Amino acid sequence: GIHIAAPGLAVQPGSPVDGLGRARLSTVYMPGYKVTMLPDDVVQTYTLQEGRDCPSVSLYVMLDEATLEIKSSETRLERVPIAHNLRHDQLDAVVTEQWLTDTAFEHQNDSQPASALREQLSFLYRLAKDLKAKREVVRGKPETFNRPDYNFRLVREAGAQGTEPQGQEEVQISIRQRGAPLDLIVAEAMILANSTWGSWMAELGVPGIYRSQASLAPGVKVRMGTKALPHAGIGVKSYAWSTSPLRR
């Protein structure tokens, strides 16, 4: 199952919260601080927080466990109990490809709850690699992650986290390699959800917010629209923006 926060259950069209979201359009991120698209109390109420039963739009995908062929899917609006929040910055060094694929390999300090979820994470990693490989066939060439991402962090006094920076903070820059197992699992889950929901809305004649790209030829840019069209860069028949309702 893929579970997405559902703030739209409470945000009514034309309401002050709806107006604020329409004015801001997206959350603004900067090192050590962010300006959220929605008011913080709305974000905190609807974020998928560990230890709570949270409103969610859920995509359930039924597949053949041996071949990983997708057989069917179902979308539900429900409350989902959130058991754990697994965070990249805490677990990328633990949830490695070797840890996921070699059952005999053990870290000296395995992190909980990741160690308790090793079997499930290993399957999700196998599924993510299969989904990526199938997209690359449609795409016509493999995706490469040869350029790293950079994390920016402000060194701040205790108690200052989450407050607006003052300008004198020390900035720490670290490298985070794209395509790490957790990164790949999340990315492929989001692509699967956005492409599945995009195709479903198109079948029903419901407009959505789509990203599309006609081809990978030089100069062909990604476009936004309200109709489902192929996205050559991702390798899917349609790609709707559906998985970041608290951010944009």
Describe each region flagged by the PLM.
Residues G1-R248:
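Electropositive polyanion-binding surfaces
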